[in-house]
Amino acid sequence: MNPIVSGASVVAAGLAIGLAAIGPGIGQGTAAAQAVEGLARQPEAEGKIRGTLLLSLAFMESLTIYGLVVALCLLFANPFAG
């Protein structure tokens, strides 16, 4: 394998997982903060808020997992290797 392609693949994999984790991380923090605020305002809606929060956290985390899959593909099943 060309050393330039190998190095670029490692850098791209690092960028893929790093950038894929930033957005969901910020979103999960914001969602959790808003859920705690909502629970403080309406404690009787705890079940509905918790269910919605867990579902939205799962969707946000899936974006990070997609970034991990792209990074692993670049590292181990590199389509650019000749």
Curated annotation (Swiss-Prot):
PANTHER family: ATP SYNTHASE LIPID-BINDING PROTEIN, MITOCHONDRIAL (PTHR10031), ATPASE PROTEIN 9 (PTHR10031:SF0). The keyword Chloroplast applies. F-type ATPases have 2 components, F(1) - the catalytic core - and F(0) - the membrane proton channel. F(1) has five subunits: alpha(3), beta(3), gamma(1), delta(1), epsilon(1). F(0) has four main subunits: a(1), b(1), b'(1) and c(10-14). The alpha and beta chains form an alternating ring which encloses part of the gamma chain. F(1) is attached to F(0) by a central stalk formed by the gamma and epsilon chains, while a peripheral stalk is formed by the delta, b and b' chains. GO terms for cellular component: chloroplast thylakoid membrane; proton-transporting ATP synthase complex; proton-transporting two-sector ATPase complex, proton-transporting domain. InterPro entries: ATP_synth_csu_bac/chlpt, ATP_synth_F0_csu, ATP_synth_F0_csu_DDCD_BS, ATP_synth_F0_csu_sf, ATPase_proteolipid_c-like_dom, F/V-ATP_Csub_sf. CDD domains: ATP-synt_Fo_c_ATPH. It is found in: Plastid, Chloroplast thylakoid membrane. The lineage of its organism: Eukaryota, Haptista, Haptophyta, Prymnesiophyceae, Coccolithales. Keywords: ATP synthesis, CF(0), Chloroplast, Hydrogen ion transport, Ion transport, Lipid-binding, Membrane, Plastid, Thylakoid, Transmembrane, Transmembrane helix, Transport. The chain crosses the membrane at residues 7-27, 57-77. This is ATP synthase subunit c, chloroplastic. It comes from Ochrosphaera neapolitana. In plastids the F-type ATPase is also known as CF(1)CF(0). It comes from the Eukaryota. Belongs to the ATPase C chain family. GO terms for molecular function: lipid binding; proton-transporting ATP synthase activity, rotational mechanism.
